């Protein structure tokens, strides 16, 4: 939706009085004041005066806000007891939905909500502003408002020595934050909400009382305005100000369906899929376009184990002629490494996978000591310093990304996510989608707050908010839906670092205690020896000694903090919420957080994203396939968990049930739980809109006795069928970064075999997907 909406109002809030407030002081009554915060109208927290020594304070103060009624305007009112010695004590906190107000005046009484009988009385007055219209762009969940840009040029006047004094320029609520400069030098710009009552504040850092305040609404648009500063003494500099309208077009796509590029890809891919299905299923006739099912591969995480297994399974699908039947491949954590490697070749699925598999073997079996060689560490440092210079936030995940690249490759790869578009240009390969989880850096676990973020060669975005950007712009700075600073696209290794930073926790601690590579790997191994099963690790990790190891010291100036999560510029920053966002079906399908009813605390209010490996919540890459607009019929679930063949799939099913997302119930029998088979089909005839799931857990069943489907093992071949997948000393534990040649060969053969040995079930499931499409076609109205 994009329109001029004449629903701007003036909200006057009169804080009247409070009564019966409890005393927070030992001897006297409280000294109370009230704060008001309305982020959709102002970046400031406003405050009443303090009324001393009273349980029944009277303020009778007015505050004014310019609001738009199409937004979700939630005001936070807080009462505090002022204290000269300690932190001010909170007395009352309340959230008030301004959208419940009608035009006119209304009084509200907010109780303490405890056994106390005290309350806060506030009067709200809402008036329509008929001469003020604002253009809003919305998808029904988030809203982009009008943007203004202020250009500031500082020019020196007078004595050059005096111009060495430092000044600070601030536009509260602007994207850029405070800007520091020497008096009379520098050029700056500020992006800020056009509808707010903003001002430019200039002050001397050694004399904060010497200020210049310029109300920005009074500045004429696109005209140069000259001022001098300071005004109370001989001027140090001249300011040249120019206010302009910000970009009208958004760089963030607000929409809940596939982007035009994905739709164009699917149109091409359908032809490949239709031909492959006709051949694989031996159909007599060509499939009509509305009979072609959407079939997807969903791969979980699991480090080197997941990467290796996915190679084996894709080779199996290719051998059966079924790989061209796939429209999407989704990956998480370790399986993203396989996809990132394969998609460097635009024709990978049309070629024999033996070549890429040999490269994989070389990397998986090589020594990893070189990843922390002095020359490598210096290279990491140089690249991190260059990224910081360009404007990328620094965090430990960036260092992990470079180390991980060295573990998986012999030299740096210049490949970027957007480069993978070439592999989709003719629909010749499935569309890859990589998954991550967005969380909060402080105070909340991923179970309290976790949002699915998807990465494709076309876009990166949040289905929950219907907000997406072109993949080459990920990492650049955005504000209110507009691109304000474009940074060079990161190499894909930095994205792999995000998608797989589950492994960075142990690596991070090992790094901080180690002085040389051998100590690092010894500590890494020691940390893993205590794990008897794979568990979801906690984000909080122990702090190192004051004197960190020499390896860590090389990066202390770049990584002053140790956040595990990847900090990157938030492309949803500055977007506001539509008044009915919570009822939107696309938002409600993914709301799973205690914060989802609190728009002032959701992701668009944060300057940075906090992106994590999905393994911190559920080890799955399925959510992108559950978007109703993708309309997936069949999911081939490739699960690489060593403990619990159905555990992660059951967690996903439970999540979908709670969210009302169509998905079959995952209820394996006790026998299946005890002895999982190579392949399990889950479907729900009562939910025709739910995809069928053909689940391939990582198990060693008939492979023990057969070297190939229908070919029994000889006594000499029995050892080749022994694959350790269950015990705590499995060579395939997710923390293992090096495999023996024998172990990697066994895992590749096992996963390839499990696909090929179930070719009949695969073909039958695909046949049912075709039938499902045909049934829907019959019942579709003309």
Swiss-Prot record:
EC assignment: the record states: 3.1.1.4, 3.1.1.5
Where do the PLA2c domain residues begin and end? 245-782
Provide the protein's localization: Cytoplasm, Cytosol; Mitochondrion membrane; Early endosome membrane
Q: In the UniProt record, does the keyword NAD occur? A: no
Molecular function via GO: calcium ion binding; lysophospholipase activity; phospholipase A2 activity
The free-text domain note is:
The N-terminal C2 domain associates with lipid membranes upon calcium binding. It modulates enzyme activity by presenting the active site to its substrate in response to elevations of cytosolic Ca(2+).
Entry protein name: Cytosolic phospholipase A2 beta
| Organism of derivation | Mus musculus
